[in-house]
Amino acid sequence: MKFIGKNALITGSANRIGKDIAMYLASIGINVALHYNKSSESAINTLREIKKHKINSNMFQADLSKEKNCLNLLKNVNQTLGPISILINNASTFKMNNLHDTKVVDLNNDFFVNLIAPFILSREIFKGNLKGKIINLTDWKTIRKNRFTYGLSKFAVSGLTKSLAISMAPRFQINEIALGAILPPVDVPTRRSKKINLGPMKRVGRIDEITSCIKMFLDNDFITGEKINIDGGRHIL
């Protein structure tokens, strides 16, 4: 793979899906910048696991709700690991609110973390001379009555994906993965069994079904501005 020995930044990669993506990239020889906000203990444990793959890796703390923190994150990664060739925008809020109890501060926070931070990171990475890939993780369902600001911000990320794909071509390809219900790590209790029978595939997704899509995006230099739903077909119902 052409990205062996290159550097990847995965936001929100201390645990859950972000961790699994970081572990996958490390397993195929890609250096990993492990980002976290508050989950320092999880980040330490994940970094320990990642380093078993004998690649360069380090952990970086940043609250992505502020521009200066996004810029400092990239500065620290560049100084520690070097320039970034792969950016996976995984960090996200997931706040419950509806039209009636949503405040402007909620909109500002969710839009900054979910939309503006990916924009800032993408723009700054593009200022270098490298070629690379950006993958935005979103949700199969962005119109959500009870996660109002989350859904709005994820809907906007789809527009960002296409706008960046045009603006950053041909050096970078920017694509999107819209996730449905995914099996949690084996050490995390699940209360999502009711979702298993939703959708044509009648089950939740697996982590390897996400990482195989990421591999495809990394390998292919002619796909950009595309969204792939990994949701067992729920988006077509």
Describe each region flagged by the PLM.
Residues 90-95, 233:
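Conserved NAD(P)H cofactor-binding loop of Rossmann-fold oxidoreductase domains
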